[in-house]
Amino acid sequence: MIGLAPHTGKIIDAVAQLDCIRSYWLVGGTALSLQLHTRQSEDLDFQKWRTSKDEKMEVAWDVIEKELSTIGEIERRDIYDFDHVEFRVAGVKFSFYACDKYSPVQNEVIYQGNIKLADVMAIGAMKMEVMLRRSNFRDYYDIYSILQTGIDIHELMNHALQYSRH
């Protein structure tokens, strides 16, 4: 499958059938690679955002773990906080985030089954924000790839500023 590392491609059909991902969007490099076909990506980063001020932002890791175990053995589980958990299943890293911010997604992209992708502009905004905290070559490459699609850098920066509440 274009955009996915081979071991991720092997399980993507099963992942697409999981009920636990319905409220999440696939974000990050993998979501971008599936849309732009710029590089192979292997991690599956799922994120959901606040929809109301009073919403409690938590990841139901026990429900997710139970469903992920239908794909393969849970090789690892790391609970970082009530809003962030990671698993390794069949050699693939899964991340689940419940973000306290409102969604930057303007156009939902249905990929397959229950997998929906954040749109390119939203991914760019999130990449720009994360680059303030870390410096990975792949993030710079992803921003370059986004700009190559014709998205205006000023529009992308404005979207990133709105997302980061600046």
Descriptions of predicted regions:
Residues 1-166:
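Compositionally biased terminal segments of proteins
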